[in-house]
Amino acid sequence: LLKELWTKMKGAGKAVLGKIKGLL
């Protein structure tokens, strides 16, 4: 369960970073 949550968090983090880079 913890591993699954960590993977989801990492995926969300990458998506957020991609959006921020797109705005910049």
From Swiss-Prot:
Compartments, as annotated in UniProt: Secreted
Keywords: Amidation, Antibiotic, Antimicrobial, Secreted
Any Gene Ontology CC annotation: extracellular region
Pfam families: Antimicrobial_9
Annotated tissue distribution: Expressed by the venom gland.
Domain of life: Eukaryota
Positions of transmembrane segments: none
Statement: the UniProt record of this protein carries the keyword Secreted: yes
Keyword Secreted set for record: yes
Leucine amide: residues bearing it: L24
A GO biological-process term: defense response to bacterium
Protein family per UniProt: Belongs to the ponericin-L family.
Role of this protein: Has a broad spectrum of activity against both Gram-positive and Gram-negative bacteria. Is inactive against yeast, erythrocytes, and insects.
Protein name as it appears in the record: U1-poneritoxin-Ng2a
Taxonomic source organism: Neoponera goeldii (Ponerine ant)
